[in-house]
């Protein structure tokens, strides 16, 4: 479930597959009526067979904890079903006791931790000025101490930034302090906000799996259709899919296998003409993404030293 409008976030990560955040915001409020979001969850539950849904996840086209009624929505959703509820978060607001209390209702929380130092945090995540590294680590540590659910920390590895032995050791030291249940290593395999962002090479991956602890594993992008192929209009189904993240054309067709590849291809072409979809070329692959997403086109500013913090 997406509780905030597109790119409503207090970070502007260089690797974000939804493009740049402009402007960055740190305002907590009810961006959408909570009852509307809960009603959409109920509708989705009613339209699927038992066993179709493994998790209900508040993931957001930005930062879910910016919705000030997140805790209430989690509790209301849990009252509807026995399906576990998860929340992905950049954990920048966990220093606030009320945010920790809201997330404590979830069965699993997936915070991001991409850096072991303030300097690298600011270089990769480009946070709102009030979202300091010290607050992030303090909040995450305090949340872990009180949280009874599953804590799975996500680390996005970027070539030349946080894939060195030194950078990974700094992250590992914080992971040892926080003691998550698992560490999920992710790679920027979809179009990132900045074109110079690349996944690490073999050496960086070897360092990561060796240094980040026994609970660390590399996870790939989700490939399920999330039930969106049940929608009646192929164009709206395509928009719903690519609004979550950019997808290669073949992925869109697999996700929407209710329609023929020709029907999906024609829908993509119409959406591009109408300005509702855009083509993003990255890593030699042609991706389709949301027309609202804004991707960088230039090279990274800064010295070689800054690229290997």
Predicted regions and their residues:
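Glycine-rich beta-strand-to-loop/alpha-helix junction loops that act as flexible
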Residues: 57-63, 90
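Short, basic/glycine-rich phosphate-binding loops at helix/coil junctions
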Residues: 16-21, 52-55, 116-120, 150-152
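Conserved AdoMet/S-adenosylmethionine-binding subsite of the radical SAM
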Residues: 66-207
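Canonical Radical SAM [4Fe-4S] cluster-binding loop centered on the CxxxCxxC motif
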Residues: 2-36
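Phosphate/pyrophosphate-binding loops at sites that engage ATP/ADP/AMP, CoA/4′-phosphopantetheine
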Residues: 43-51, 176
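Short strand-loop junctions, especially beta-strand C-caps/beta-turns
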Residues: 2-4, 59-61, 156-158, 188, ...
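Auxiliary Fe-S-binding modules of radical SAM enzymes
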Residues: 163-309
């Amino acid at each position: 479930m997406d509780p905030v409008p597109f790119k409503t976030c207090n970070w502007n990560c260089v690797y974000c597959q939804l493009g740049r955040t402009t402007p960055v915001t740190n305002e907590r409020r009810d961006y959408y009526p909570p009852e509307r979001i809960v009603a959409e969850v109920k509708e989705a539950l009613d339209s699927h067979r038992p066993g179709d849904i493994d998790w209900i996840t508040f993931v957001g086209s930005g930062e879910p904890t910016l919705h000030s009624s997140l805790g209430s929505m989690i509790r209301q959703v849990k009252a509807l079903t026995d399906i576990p509820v998860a929340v992905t978060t950049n954990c920048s607001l966990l220093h606030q006791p009320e945010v920790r209390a809201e997330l404590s209702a979830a069965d699993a929380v997936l915070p991001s931790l991409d850096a072991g130092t303030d300097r690298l945090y600011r270089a990769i995540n480009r946070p709102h000025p009030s979202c300091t590294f010290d607050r992030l680590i303090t909040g995450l540590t305090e949340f872990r101490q009180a949280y009874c659910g599953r804590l799975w920390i996500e680390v996005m590895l970027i070539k030349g930034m946080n894939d060195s032995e030194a950078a990974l050791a700094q992250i590992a030291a914080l992971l040892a302090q926080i003691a998550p249940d698992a560490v999920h290593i992710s790679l920027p395999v979809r179009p990132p906000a900045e074109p110079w962002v690349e996944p690490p090479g073999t050496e960086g991956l070897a360092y990561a799996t060796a240094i980040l602890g026994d609970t660390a594993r590399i996870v790939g992008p989700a490939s399920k259709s999330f039930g969106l192929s049940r929608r009646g209009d192929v164009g709206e189904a395509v928009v719903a899919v690519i609004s979550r993240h950019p997808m290669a054309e073949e992925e869109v067709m697999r996700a929407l296998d209710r329609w023929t590849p020709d029907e999906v291809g024609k829908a993509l072409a119409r959406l591009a003409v109408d300005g509702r979809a855009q083509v993003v070329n990255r890593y030699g692959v042609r991706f389709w993404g949301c027309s609202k997403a804004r991707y960088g086109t230039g090279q990274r500013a800064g010295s070689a030293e800054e690229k290997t913090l």
